[in-house]
Design a protein with these regions (language model features):
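N-terminal active-site segment of His-dependent metallophosphoesterases
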Residues: 4-93
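A short acidic-Thr-Gly-centered motif at the start of a beta-strand
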Residues: 30-38, 67-68, 96-99, 178-181, ...
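A general structural motif
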Residues: 39, 71-73, 102-104, 183, ...
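Active-site neighborhood of phospho(di)ester-bond hydrolases with catalytic His/Asp-centered motifs
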Residues: 45-46, 77-80, 107-110, 223-229, ...
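Metal-dependent catalytic neighborhoods of phosphoester/phosphodiester hydrolases
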Residues: 82-98, 118-125, 235-236
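Catalytic-core regions built around general acid/base machinery
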Residues: 92-102, 168-175
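Active-site HxH/HxHxD metal-binding segment of metal-dependent hydrolases
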Residues: 103-138
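Acidic, His/Gly-enriched loop-helix segments that form or flank divalent-metal centers
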Residues: 121, 135-242, 246-252, 258-266
Length: 266
């Protein structure tokens, strides 16, 4: 039994009655197993949130995996939320900007990167951002933040971040993609809006959606690989896979490995 099948079994045990379980397995039997193109291996990495230590460890594991199991085309897909919450947001971006990888890397945008760029042009958003780890990001750039800052202080902090933000970080964040597709898989930070074709999804939904997506059991036409909503362990459903395991708090950064029709975790 593969990881994909185990995920369906585990989800069925937790959430389905017996009739629903039989229905879920009939659905899987009718459809071919999701796969990536021949000769391609994907490493999808969940929300990093300022944990440069975990990122470095994961990149080393990926390098070791490629060295011991070479593949024609390797692709790293980062699902966004590189910053906030953890202590080393600047160091995470430094590492990703350097990107001295010998294979393709795809960097997706998360809602926390949106917070940062919005703060630069709309300082009062700090009142919200500070509750989601924004102060930790400011501190990683050498800025001493003020809790419950007034409008003048918010503007000063935004100006300080604007000065401290390296041009390489600015370009990196500005070039982040909203989604990525490969084979039978669609990658986005938060998920997708049910009922809307994948090619017509709004960036707001790709970055922010939660319940409407998480509670949906319909077929999205591809398996959606996402983060955004922390779970204790990777959550495999028939229509989506969540790999945000709350790295900033748990110390567990998850990488999903896809090759042919096989799925496992690192």
């Amino acid at each position: 039994m593969t990881a994909f099948d185990r995920g369906i079994v585990n989800h069925a045990s937790a959430s389905y009655n017996r009739a629903d379980m039989r229905s879920a397995f009939r659905l899987r039997k009718k459809k071919p197993r999701p796969r990536v193109p021949e000769g391609v291996r994907i490493y999808a990495i969940g929300d990093i949130h300022g944990r440069a230590d975990l990122l470095e460890r994961m990149l080393n594991r990926i390098d070791a995996d490629l060295a011991s199991n070479p593949v024609r085309i390797g692709i790293q897909v980062f699902l966004g939320d590189y910053i906030d919450r953890g202590p080393a947001s600047r160091e995470v971006l430094d590492r990703l900007v350097a990107n001295n990888r010998s294979f393709r890397s795809v960097f997706l945008k998360g809602n926390h990167e949106r917070y940062l760029t919005d703060f630069l042009t709309n300082p009062p958003i700090l009142g919200v951002w500070q509750h989601y780890g924004g102060l930790e990001t400011l501190m990683s750039y050498g800025i001493t933040p003020s809790i419950n800052a007034n409008a003048a202080t918010q503007a000063q902090l935004a100006a300080a971040l604007d000065r401290a933000l390296p041009e390489s970080h600015r370009q990196f964040i500005g070039n982040l993609e909203s989604s990525f597709t490969c084979g039978d898989f669609f990658f986005a930070h938060a998920g997708v809006r049910p009922g809307i074709p994948l090619t017509k999804q709004r960036e707001e939904d790709l970055l922010w959606i939660r319940e409407d997506f998480l509670l949906c059991e319909e077929d999205f036409s591809k398996i959606v690989v996402h983060g955004h909503t922390p779970v204790p362990q990777p959550d495999i459903r028939p229509n989506r896979i969540n790999i945000d395991t709350g790295a900033f708090a748990t110390g567990q950064l998850t990488c999903l490995r896809l090759e042919d029709d096989k799925l496992d975790f690192m």
